[in-house]
Amino acid sequence: AYSWDNRVKYVVRYMYDIDDDGFLDKNDFECLAVRNTLIEGRGEFSAADYANNQKIMRNLWNEIAELADFNKDGEVTVDEFKMAVQKHCQGKKYSEFPGAFKVFIANQFKAIDVNGDGKVGLDEYRLDCITRSAFAEVKEIDDAYDKLTTEDDRKAGGLTLERYQDLYAQFISNPNESCSACFLFGPLKVVQ
């Protein structure tokens, strides 16, 4: 479940492919604009925030399509996305990623940081994990958090944005199946 191939499939399936049709397209990013607006507003819908999120997500889709829609059919398949990650991210640090990836990572952090304190603590990590997978025991999630975080992270109250960015970069660019970043999104399942 922690192979690089599965991790990239996981990102496509659970982070971007919001409409669950097996590929990325403009509709996924329109849906992400609504989702992000509601998450940021904690259920309240702000037309101004939505307009801003729509602009961000449209720009993000356009950039991802430019980087990954190799056959220019308006859809980015899992294989195309993997090729784009290999070309633009593999072996690179977060600071070297294309803007589209950076924007998405920052937005993902904002969505997980439910209380807005600038850190992702264990409680927020748990909430994020249960949105994508089913767990019979919370210990599975807590064990993954312990593998992900360092003592310094835990003393600080959780993952800062900078630390999250670094871990996300490792998650999609580091082929090592035992790196701590493999647990960024909790215990992973094999993506079919």
Swiss-Prot record:
Q: Where is the EF-hand domain?
A: 4-39, 56-91, 100-135, 136-171
Alphabetically list the UniProt keywords: Acetylation, Calcium, Metal-binding, Muscle protein, Repeat
Instruction: Report the GO molecular function annotations.
Output: calcium ion binding
Binding of Ca(2+) 2 occurs at D69, N71, D73, E75, E80
> Gene3D superfamilies recorded for this chain?
EF-hand
Miscellaneous: The sarcoplasmic calcium-binding proteins are abundant in the muscle of arthropods, mollusks, annelids, and protochordates. This protein has three functional calcium-binding sites; potential site 4 has lost affinity for calcium.
Job of this protein: Like parvalbumins, SCPs seem to be more abundant in fast contracting muscles, but no functional relationship can be established from this distribution.
Name of protein: Sarcoplasmic calcium-binding protein, alpha-B and -A chains
